[in-house]
UniProtKB/Swiss-Prot annotation:
Its EC number is 2.7.4.8. Its main location: cytoplasm. The lineage of its organism: Bacteria, Bacillati, Mycoplasmatota, Mollicutes, Acholeplasmatales. It comes from Onion yellows phytoplasma (strain OY-M). This is Guanylate kinase. It catalyses: GMP + ATP = GDP + ADP.
Amino acid sequence: MKLNKKGLLIVLSGPSGVGKATVRKALFEMTNHNFVYSVSATTRKPRPGEQDGKDYHFLTKEEFEKGIENNCFLEWAKFIDHYYGTPKKQIQDFLKQGKEVFLEIEVEGATHLRKKRIPNTVFIFLVPPEKKALYDRLKKRGTEQEANIAKRIAKANNEFHLAHKYDYIVVNDEVANAADRIIAIIRAEHAKTKRSIRNYLKILEDNGYAEQ
């Protein structure tokens, strides 16, 4: 019996401005677990401090649309006149290596991804402690005009109604607390019966007790 350990695909999603990147970065700093971040692609301009290939793959509209034609994205969506997408190959490679792959994507992208029913995928919806916090965070960025902030808030109001379709909801009241909750979720997912049995059978196999 040959069993390969495969990692979880952890989809961290939520409205724009909820703090997905901040929580994910804090989580990576808090643990030495086998986490990798799947860098998304976008056609929007980099924000201050963002690096190409680290925070996003920044593409032109033409480059992104060519990627769509060539089926290079696991999921993609258009949001406030910009494309966002998840390159497919890097995720496949990471999961085969048994790594825990973090996706940090918009709600529309998560909706498309859920329809693919990829095994070992965990969907986490990040929400602010109150709606005003979302506006304050978007305003604090200093990169959005008031009209765009209004569009993002209106979209967020619709997205909140999709929270029940996720496996977990995490409130981002304090970054460290939110990161702790996600770590607890991942531990709980690994403790689920199906995954525990898979790991137990692997231990038996390694010790010569595998089925003949």
